[in-house]
Amino acid sequence: MAESREHTFTGTRGRNTVRAWPHDRPRYVAVLVHGYGEHIGRYEYVADRLVRHGAAVYGPDHMGHGRSDGDRVHIEDFEDVVTDVRSVVEHARAEHPGVPVVVIGHSMGGLISTRYAQRHGDDLTALVLSGPVIGEWEVLTTLLAYDEPPHTPIDPATLSRDPVVGTAYAEDPLVWHGPFKRPTLEALATTLAEIAKNGRLGALPTLWVHGADDALVPLAGSRTGIEATKGTNLTERIYPGGRHEVFNETNKDEVLDDVTTFIDRALPRL
């Protein structure tokens, strides 16, 4: 695997940890935006593939996640998380001036990345969304019906057909295994509405990848968000039998081949 290093910065709500996988002469910068309850350390394989493809890779642990400060999984405003991701992008651009930037967001990270593209699309050469929480998410509606969300942990089997992935997730001390926090659910609802209100992504090359059998963020609900935000340059790849984490699926190399092929098309020709 590619070597990595960590640094911290002062984010909107405290100290945030960032992992970087360096490249001496990158063709592009990739910023990985992780999902709910997890951390950027779960993206080692993805980062390694991207480094070998010519990227300098960066990824923050969001507030309340992984090694970053904050009450666990407590997010009151996702606009703050978008601002933190912008800080990572600016750091990467300072280290690699003039190099194209690609943002890759998974699940809740897809929501954050979509909102980033709406706010700062001029920063980006391409956007990749994996199982994104955009559009209609029935899980959110169900959980918001409770005054206190029930303690219903994510079933590791819903992540991937590879049982090793589920076992590692269940045993990972940096993964949150408790209930959703109500402020986080309310912030998710607010941001879904904000994304719907702010419209399409214009000409930004966008790749949407999704598992057809995703039970956590079902395909049909995300499609409503994709249809509402897609611009003039959308590519979609739906993987039969795939579950929520297509980057950790049994066909992950196929998925990452699709990602790198898409990035090659999106990068400016020298």
Placement of each model-derived feature along the sequence:
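Catalytic nucleophile-loop/oxyanion-hole region of alpha/beta-hydrolase
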Residues: 37-39, 66-96, 255
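Active-site nucleophile loop of the alpha/beta-hydrolase fold
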Residues: 128-137
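Active-site glycine-rich loops that stabilize anionic/oxyanionic intermediates
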Residues: 27, 35-38, 212
